[in-house]
C-alpha cells in the first residue's frame, strides 16, 4: 500500500472541518422550516400557542426564513417554571413555537448529524435509535463481557455524576468546541441562541463576578433567591443552558466528549459508558477504577464542570449497585441480576391513586390512565418480579375496575390472567 493511499485512509477517518466546505444555507429553506414546524407540532398541537402558529404558519415561516437569512433572528422571551420529577427540581424555560421551529432546524439539520461522528458508541442519550434502554443494555453487556473475559465477578465498577451539569456549561467553551465543526451559517445562530441562556448576575460584587465561572452555579437556587429587582442587566454570566431546549440536549450529548475520549482512548477503558451526566467505568481493580475517575475529574475541571462527590463512588461487581434507576448484581456464574428500585414502584402506586382523584373530578379519563399505566408497566416489567407486577395490576383493578389486554402469550398477559384467577 502506498504512503499516499495510507494517508487518504487515515484522514478519511476524521470528518473534514465543516466550516471549510461549500454548503447550502439550509436554515432558510422553506421546505426544511416546514418539516421543522411539523416536528414542533407533535405532542403539542392541542396547546393554544401552537394552534395560533398553525393558523398563520406560512407567514410565520416566511418571517422566520427572512430573519434567519438577514441574521436578525432573536429568541423570544418565554415563561419560566420549576418542574419536579423523582424528587428533583429542574428549572425549565417554555420555548415559544417559532423558537422551537428554529431549534428543530438547527439540531435536526446541523448539530445532530455534524456532531454525531465525534461521539463514542456507548454515549446513549437523546439520539435516534438510542435512549435509556440502549444505555442499560450496553451496561449489562459490559457486565456480561467482564465475566466472560475473567470468569469471575471480582472486579469493580465506578460511577461518576456531574453535578448541576446543564447549569455549568460555559458558553465560550461550547463555542470553542462546537463552532469549528459546523458551518458559519449555523455558527452565528448557535452564538445567538447561547445569548438567551446568559444569566443576569448584576447583584454580584466585582470579586464574585471575577470568580463566577469557577464557582458551581445552581439555577434553582438563583431562581428562588435572587429577586427580579436585582437583575438589572448590568452584567451577565456566560454560563448555563436551559435543560428544556433542544439545543441544550445536543450539547449535553456532545460537550463532555473530551471525558469520553480520555476514558476510551487515553486510558483504553474497554467498559465505559455515559448517559448525559451519569458515567460508569468497569475495571479489574479498585485502584485502576479510582485512577480513571481521578483523570475524569481533571477533564471535567478543564471543561468547567463539577463532579458530585456524594454520588461518585466505587462498588464491587459482586455487590448490589445502581445505575440509571436499576439495581444490578453480577453473580459468580456470570448472571446479571437486575431489579427496579423500590421507590420507583412506590412512586407509580402514588400516581395511580392520584389519577383516581383526577378521574373523579373529570380532569382525566379512564383511557388516559390506562395509557399511562400500560406505558409504565410495559417499560419496567423486565426489571420487576412476578409478585411486583401482580401487585401493581391488582392495585390498578381496585382503583379503576378495568382489565388491560396485553399481547397474547406475553408475560404481562399471563400474569394478568393469574391475577384474575386469584382475585376471582
PLM segments and residue spans:
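Non-catalytic, polymerase-adjacent accessory regions of viral genome-replication enzymes
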Residues: 1-62, 413, 418-424
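Right-hand nucleic-acid polymerase module
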Residues: 2-10, 95, 100, 104, ...
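Active-site-proximal segment of RNA-dependent polymerases
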Residues: 21-23, 109-170
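Short, conserved non-catalytic motifs in the polymerase core
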Residues: 45-51, 76-101, 118-131, 201-253
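Amphipathic alpha-helical blocks
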Residues: 53-77
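Conserved polymerase palm-domain catalytic core
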Residues: 142, 149-276, 280-295, 315, ...
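A common structural junction motif
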Residues: 182, 297-305
Amino acid at each position: 500500500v502506498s504512503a499516499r493511499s495510507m494517508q487518504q485512509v487515515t484522514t478519511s477517518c476524521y470528518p473534514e472541518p465543516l466550516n471549510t466546505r461549500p454548503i447550502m444555507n439550509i436554515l432558510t429553506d422553506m421546505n426544511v422550516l416546514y418539516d421543522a414546524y411539523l416536528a414542533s407540532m407533535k405532542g403539542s398541537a392541542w396547546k393554544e400557542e401552537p394552534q395560533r402558529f398553525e393558523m398563520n404558519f406560512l407567514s410565520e415561516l416566511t418571517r422566520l426564513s427572512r430573519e434567519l437569512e438577514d441574521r436578525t433572528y432573536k429568541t423570544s422571551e418565554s415563561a419560566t417554571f420549576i418542574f419536579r420529577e423523582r424528587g428533583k427540581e429542574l428549572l425549565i424555560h417554555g420555548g415559544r413555537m417559532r423558537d422551537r421551529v428554529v431549534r428543530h432546524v438547527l439540531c435536526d439539520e446541523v448539530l445532530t448529524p455534524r456532531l454525531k461522528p465525534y461521539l463514542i458508541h456507548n454515549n446513549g442519550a437523546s439520539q435516534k435509535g438510542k435512549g435509556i434502554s440502549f444505555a442499560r443494555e450496553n451496561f449489562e453487556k459490559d457486565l456480561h463481557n467482564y465475566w466472560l473475559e475473567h470468569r469471575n465477578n471480582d472486579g469493580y465498577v465506578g460511577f461518576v455524576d456531574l453535578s448541576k451539569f446543564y447549569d455549568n456549561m460555559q458558553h465560550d467553551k461550547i463555542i470553542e468546541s462546537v463552532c469549528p465543526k459546523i458551518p458559519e451559517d449555523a455558527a452565528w445562530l448557535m452564538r445567538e441562541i447561547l445569548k438567551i441562556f446568559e444569566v443576569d448576575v448584576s447583584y454580584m460584587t466585582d470579586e464574585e463576578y471575577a470568580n463566577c465561572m469557577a464557582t458551581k452555579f445552581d439555577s434553582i437556587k438563583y431562581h428562588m433567591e435572587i429577586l427580579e429587582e436585582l437583575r438589572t442587566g448590568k452584567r451577565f454570566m456566560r454560563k448555563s443552558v436551559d435543560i428544556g431546549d433542544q439545543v441544550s440536549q445536543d450539547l449535553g450529548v456532545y460537550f463532555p466528549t473530551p471525558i469520553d475520549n480520555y476514558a476510551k482512548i487515553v486510558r483504553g477503558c474497554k467498559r465505559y459508558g455515559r448517559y448525559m451526566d451519569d458515567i460508569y467505568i468497569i475495571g479489574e481493580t479498585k485502584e485502576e477504577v479510582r485512577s480513571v475517575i481521578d483523570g475524569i475529574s481533571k477533564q471535567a475541571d478543564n471543561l468547567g464542570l463539577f463532579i458530585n462527590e456524594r454520588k461518585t463512588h466505587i462498588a464491587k461487581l459482586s455487590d448490589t449497585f445502581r445505575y440509571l434507576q436499576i439495581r444490578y448484581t453480577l453473580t459468580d456464574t456470570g448472571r446479571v441480576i437486575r431489579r427496579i428500585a423500590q421507590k420507583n414502584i412506590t412512586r407509580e402506586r402514588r400516581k395511580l391513586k392520584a389519577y383516581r382523584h383526577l378521574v373523579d373530578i373529570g380532569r382525566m379519563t379512564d383511557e388516559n390512565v390506562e395509557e399511562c399505566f400500560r406505558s409504565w408497566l410495559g417499560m419496567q416489567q423486565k426489571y420487576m418480579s412476578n409478585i411486583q407486577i401482580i401487585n401493581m395490576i391488582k392495585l390498578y383493578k381496585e382503583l379503576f375496575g378495568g382489565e388491560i389486554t396485553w399481547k397474547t402469550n406475553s408475560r404481562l398477559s399471563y400474569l394478568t390472567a393469574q391475577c384474575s384467577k386469584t382475585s376471582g
